[in-house]
């Protein structure tokens, strides 16, 4: 699961008695001090919703100089509702981005458009995302394009542009799953994000409907639920 998606779906646990623990394939190497294994293990725990274990392994990897792990630490600090720390997250994300982490660029951009981190800087955020979105071999390109689409769909800090939003969502979906980006945008407008996205039922319906039209079943389900609710 992408990092930006986890902001909406954090703390969702999947209890499967017969399944291995998240990232178990990385555990041996992580315990032996392999910083990339530590990062991948942290990322696995983050995606599964265990922020405590994610932070433990991300910190180990970051201490060894892994820039992506530093970006993940920043993401954790803007995800955990118990200990939100946007200023510290910004410091970590800047460090990660300066070290060349595309994940760091996306996370920093997300922080820069949220008022909880101070005065928003949309031009810098958009520049970071445009840069990250060009590396299609990197998973962060999916998140970068989704966030660009959301910024244009939201129309705060910059002029709203649904055509640009649609273009970025489709580009993101083309390298992930068709209709998912529009679904994600719809759910963001449905639930809101403090400091960035205000709840907006009409925008939620618009993007969920487009997701459904793209063939994303969950988008259809949420659109129907919201329409009839």
Swiss-Prot record:
Q: Which is a Pfam family this sequence falls into?
A: Sel1
Question: InterPro entries, alphabetically?
Answer: Mitotic_Regulator (IPR052945), Sel1-like (IPR006597), TPR-like_helical_dom_sf (IPR011990)
Keyword list, A-Z: Repeat, Signal
The signal peptide, as residue positions, is 1-17
Q: Which domain of life is it from?
A: Bacteria
The UniProt entry annotates Sel1-like repeats at 48-66, 85-101, 143-173, 180-215
The protein depicted here goes by the name Sel1-repeat-containing protein YjcO
Origin organism lineage: Bacteria, Pseudomonadati, Pseudomonadota, Gammaproteobacteria, Enterobacterales
Task: Name the gene.
Answer: yjcO
């Amino acid at each position: 699961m992408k990092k930006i998606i986890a902001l909406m779906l954090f703390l969702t646990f999947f209890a499967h008695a017969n399944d291995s623990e998240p990232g178990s394939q990385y555990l041996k190497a992580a315990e032996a001090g392999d910083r990339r294994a530590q990062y991948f293990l942290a990322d696995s725990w983050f995606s599964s919703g265990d922020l405590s274990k994610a932070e433990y392994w991300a910190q180990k990897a970051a201490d060894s100089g892994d820039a992506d792990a530093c970006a993940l630490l920043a993401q954790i600090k803007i995800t955990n509702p118990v200990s939100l720390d946007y200023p510290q997250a910004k410091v970590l994300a800047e460090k990660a981005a300066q070290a060349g982490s595309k994940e760091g660029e996306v996370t920093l951009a997300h922080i820069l458009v949220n008022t909880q981190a101070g005065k928003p800087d949309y031009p810098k955020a958009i520049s970071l995302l445009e840069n990250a979105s060009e590396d299609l071999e990197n998973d962060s390109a999916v998140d970068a394009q989704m966030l660009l689409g959301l910024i244009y769909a939201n129309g705060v800090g910059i002029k709203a542009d649904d055509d640009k939003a649609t273009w970025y969502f489709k580009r993101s979906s083309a390298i992930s799953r068709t209709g998912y980006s529009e679904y994600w945008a719809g759910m963001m407008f449905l639930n809101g994000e403090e400091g960035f996205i205000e709840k907006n039922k009409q925008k939620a319906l618009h993007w969920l409907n487009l997701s459904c039209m793209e063939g994303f079943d969950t988008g259809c389900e949420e659109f129907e639920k919201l329409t009839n609710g």
